[in-house]
Structure formats: structure tokens, C-alpha cells
A protein has these predicted regions:
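Aromatic-residue detector
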Residues: 1-2, 41
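Charge-dense, low-complexity polyampholytic segments
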Residues: 22, 48-54
Length: 54
């Protein structure tokens, strides 16, 4: 995972929700809820913030 402190981006593109952890590391999800849950888990463990771009 990238350095602690960098925000985690959640955004929608081509009908998929993407979680961008930084440094090219991303995940795809079918719903905003799934993407938020994944991002929140990492953010809490690494003391990072989540930015949701709707």
C-alpha cells in the first residue's frame, strides 16, 4: 500500500465504482456501498481519509 496519509479516492467510471489507493493500485466494485466499505477498512487501518467523487 502507498504511504500512510494519502487520501483514498472513490469514483465512478464506466458504470463501475473504483477505489484508488494511490500509486496505481485500484479496485473495481459494482456498487458505491461496496467501494466505500473497502476504502473505509483500509483508511481506518492506515489512518487515511476517503474522498468520494460522485
Amino acid at each position: 500500500m502507498p504511504e500512510s496519509g494519502l487520501p483514498i479516492r472513490v469514483y465512478k467510471e464506466n458504470d463501475m465504482w473504483h477505489v484508488d489507493y494511490g500509486e496505481g493500485e485500484t479496485e473495481e466494485h459494482t456498487s458505491l456501498e461496496e467501494a466505500e466499505s473497502a476504502a473505509d477498512a483500509v483508511a481506518q487501518a492506515e489512518e487515511r481519509t476517503v474522498v468520494i467523487e460522485e
